[in-house]
Structure formats: C-alpha cells, structure tokens
Amino acid sequence: ISDGGIQEEISQGAGRLAGHLGLDNLIMFYDSNDIQLSTATDAVTSEDVAKKYEAWHWKVITIDGNDPDAIRTALTEAKAVTGQPTLIIGKTIMGKGARKADDSSYERNCATHGAPLGGDAYINTIKNLGGDPTNPF
C-alpha cells in the first residue's frame, strides 16, 4: 500500500477489522516514502501510522524498504506471527537510483509519480544502479 492509499478510509476500515479478527495470515507492505501523488505526506497528515496499526492490534515491523535483505527478514518474521495481522513499514526513497537525461536525480521528486523513464534517463538509471543498459535484465 502507498502513502496515499494508507490514508484512504477503505484501507483504515479493513485495517481495523483485520486487527479485530486477528487475521494472522495477512501481511501488508506499506511503501512509506513520504510522498503521495500530488505532494509530500506531511503537507496533509501528521499521524503516526505505526501507532495507529498497533492500536488496531497489528504487529508492526519497520525496515529499510530499499534493502532486499531487510525485506526478506521482515517477511520471515511476519509469517511467524500468530493471532494478529502484520504491517511491514518499508521506509523507502521514491525513485531510488533513478537519473534524468542530464544525470540529475529523480529521487524524492513528487513529479516522478507516473513518469516512465525513457531514452537517456533510462540509460543513466540502469548505469547508476550498476547495470548494463544494453542488457538490463
């Protein structure tokens, strides 16, 4: 779920119910990059998401969401939880490693939402992430 999505009432209602029912087969990953579709999240909310979900009887695990090992460890921990759902809060950097055509950074840029990388931006990003643009996968 995204920063904007976690603010939506439907996700909050489902979150309250899942905690109340103790749905321990539910693991939700929250991509917390502090940016939503049109602005930084602190422009529209000051809530503590972790405390809110803990109050709803969720197990909350906060990690570096850009670290694959931290994600694996959190998922292993979450699968072992019984009697309550788990929220993994991955603190991430939106556009991590993405570079513009002029090689400046796309990181933490709200305008990056829905903006596909093409041309030189694509090539610069693959290079910046340690890949080969001629064989990126």
Residue ranges and their predicted role:
Residues 1-137:
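Glycine-rich ThDP/TPP pyrophosphate-binding loop and its adjacent helix/strand module
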